[in-house]
């Protein structure tokens, strides 16, 4: 009987759902998933080393378009102690601590009066033996909806080349309704 009780106890413990992973920082990944869930039509401007191309897009895959914004999610176990919190009322701001070597250098979200993101800005950079890369990502929102975003940056071979510079700018035209 005792064995049965112990077995039943372990079975109940094993069936309880595991807790959500701890979030030490603003849950940007969750916010980005929410923003990506609504279809969006954008006018996109791409500038590559001074050459400009304008693309009117009927509807874009926001998950792919904003893949670089996913890099700014700080809620990874290895990042937990690597950032200094410089937040203030209405501003969420994290800066990489001195001596740390992680790609996200700065993470800032300005909130509107309802506590929703209004301006989002991230600085990401990395270097290895071959490349040096830097990116600045920004997004503007009104009432929780994206009105524009910009991804700009450069990449270069460390020793032998001038950097390739790029900018991708998207301006929301209107929300696309799904049928």
What are these regions (language model features)?
Residues 1-15:
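Sec-dependent bacterial lipoprotein signal peptides
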Residues 36-117:
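Surface-exposed acidic loop/strand-edge motifs in secreted or periplasmic proteins
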Residues 92-179:
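Gly/Pro-enriched, hydrophobic low-complexity segments
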Residues 15-29:
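Bacterial Sec signal peptide processing site at the extreme N-terminus
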């Amino acid at each position: 009987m005792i064995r049965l009780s112990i077995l039943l106890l372990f079975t109940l413990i094993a069936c309880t759902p595991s807790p959500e992973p701890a979030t030490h920082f603003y849950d940007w990944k969750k916010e980005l998933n929410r923003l990506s869930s609504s279809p969006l039509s954008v006018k996109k401007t791409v500038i590559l080393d001074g050459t400009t191309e304008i693309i009117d897009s009927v509807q874009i895959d926001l998950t792919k378009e904003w893949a670089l914004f996913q890099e700014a999610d700080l809620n990874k176990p290895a990042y937990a102690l690597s950032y200094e919190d410089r937040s203030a009322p209405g501003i969420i701001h994290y800066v990489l601590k001195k001596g740390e070597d992680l790609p996200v250098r700065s993470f800032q979200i300005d909130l509107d009066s309802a506590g929703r993101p209004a301006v989002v800005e991230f600085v990401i950079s990395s270097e290895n033996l071959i490349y040096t890369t830097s990116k600045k990502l920004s997004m503007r929102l009104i009432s929780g909806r994206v009105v524009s975003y910009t991804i700009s940056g450069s990449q270069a071979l460390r020793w032998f080349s001038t950097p390739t510079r790029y900018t991708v700018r998207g301006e929301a035209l209107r929300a696309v309704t799904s049928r």
